A protein has these predicted regions:
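Active-site-adjacent helix-turn-beta-strand microarchitecture at beta-sheet edges
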Residues: 143, 148-265
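S-adenosyl-L-methionine-dependent nucleic acid methyltransferase catalytic domains
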Residues: 1-151, 233, 240-406
């Protein structure tokens, strides 16, 4: 059912928030022509088979993670099969896991998506170093498995900005007239060619077993622009300028996206909340504006909020009423900024000072008169909330809180 009074737009393939069993909802979406084969990106952060129950900051029950072993693997496999059918032919899926089940789920993903469509095993630093008392190395990482539905997929390579130190180390030369930093690279490549790139240029033949990277006419144009460096022995090399570089290509180890609760910063309080900048990287890399993004375990709604911020449409699913309530709070109050802070700030609510019970939508500020971290408020109203019986009755309190907060 569509919850009455909650939809504020919600075109057939627009933003949708579902409350219920994601297996049943994914199955239903297979019959929706606006969704099947139209999802450009899937990100899921499923339970990690911890056999634990999780609570929010206010001690509200959030969800249980009680599956393990073969039952857990089958639970994920069933959902991956449906998610593959919902993906577009050029779509991608990212599955976020920890060390317990990542290896088992990779085998399942090889089966469902094909081993040739495996792209990356991404290692993410999730927290600060730990002082472990047990005999093992500190567990500070988790993993993201990146697969695509086919060899042709949307991909916008992410880059990190050059630091001054690294730029000076890799681009070691400075062009005197302009002050531009550059490095020198060969203008030849392996392999013999008998066309234009195999002919002499300026009286120089390519080195044995090699060919010029560019035809002689292109090399002439480059030289006329000052882009060829000639050594004292007459050896030509190409100048590559730092200011023409897009940045440092991102690799498969991500150190900058620790979880919010490991950064002592203002968050929603949901136990599995992910860093918004992590989702920004994934969404920007594997989708375009207007594309449909799906999160089948949407939790605190980070994926949905970031997708809206970046101009994507989205579908979010969760079977926890606390999760849906947290999503609505986030939609009403906006994303909080991520960042590192040297000094710990104990977060308390204004209501806590008066001994009143906290609510999901209350205003959280820092204690001891420290100003609250500025909020990047972006209210999200263009979505529809769907809940099937018998689930819908559990949402009443959260819906009413959300509507009062608008």
């Amino acid at each position: 059912m569509l919850w009455p009074g909650v939809s504020a737009g919600g075109a057939p393939a627009g933003n949708r928030l579902y409350y219920g069993d994601n297996l049943l909802i994914l199955s239903d979406l297979l019959g929706d022509d606006c969704v099947r084969g139209k999802v450009r990106l899937v990100y899921i952060d499923p339970p990690f088979a911890t056999q634990s129950a999780f609570e929010t900051r206010s001690q509200s029950h959030a969800y249980e993670d009680l599956l393990a072993g073969a039952n857990y693997v089958e639970y994920i496999r069933e959902r991956l099969i449906f998610l593959r059918e919902l993906l577009s032919s050029d779509g991608s899926i990212y599955v976020h896991l920890d060390q317990k089940m990542a290896f088992a789920i990779k085998i399942i993903m090889d089966e469902v998506f094909g081993s040739t469509n495996f792209r990356n095993w991404i290692t993410r630093k999730k927290c600060n170093p730990k002082n472990y008392t047990r005999k093992a190395y500190g567990n500070v990482s988790d993993f993201i498995l990146f697969y695509t539905k086919s060899p042709r997929y949307v991909w916008h390579r992410p880059f990190r900005e050059w630091t001054a130190e690294r730029g000076a180390r890799e681009y070691t030369y400075v062009e005197k007239p302009t002050g531009r930093r550059y490095k020198k690279v060969p203008i030849h490549a392996p392999g013999v060619r008998h066309g234009e790139t195999g002919k002499p240029w300026r009286g120089l033949a390519p080195p044995p077993g090699k060919h010029w990277q560019f035809p002689p006419r292109t090399l002439e144009e480059m030289d006329s622009r000052g882009e060829i460096h000639w050594s004292t022995t007459g050896n030509p090399r190409r100048k590559i300028y730092l200011d023409n570089s897009k940045g440092v290509p991102v690799q498969d180890i991500w150190l900058e996206f620790r979880d919010p609760h490991n950064q002592n910063i203002k968050i929603t309080g949901y136990p599995t909340e992910k860093n918004p900048d992590l989702l920004r990287r994934i969404i920007n890399a594997s989708s375009d504006q207007g594309d449909l993004v799906l999160d089948g375990f949407c939790g605190s709604g980070t994926t949905l909020a970031v997708a809206s911020e970046l101009g994507r449409r989205w579908i979010g699913i969760d079977n926890s009423p606390e999760a849906i309530g947290t999503v609505l709070r986030r939609f009403a109050r906006g994303l909080e900024p991520m960042g590192d802070f040297v000094r710990r700030q104990r977060l308390v609510s204004k209501r806590a000072r008066t001994s009143e019970p906290p609510t999901l939508f209350e205003d959280w500020t820092t204690d001891q008169g420290v100003p609250a971290i500025g909020s990047r408020v972006r209210m999200i109203r263009d979505f529809s909330l769907f809940a099937s019986e018998p689930y819908s009755g559990e949402l009443k309190r959260y819906i009413e809180d959300w509507q009062r907060s608008l």
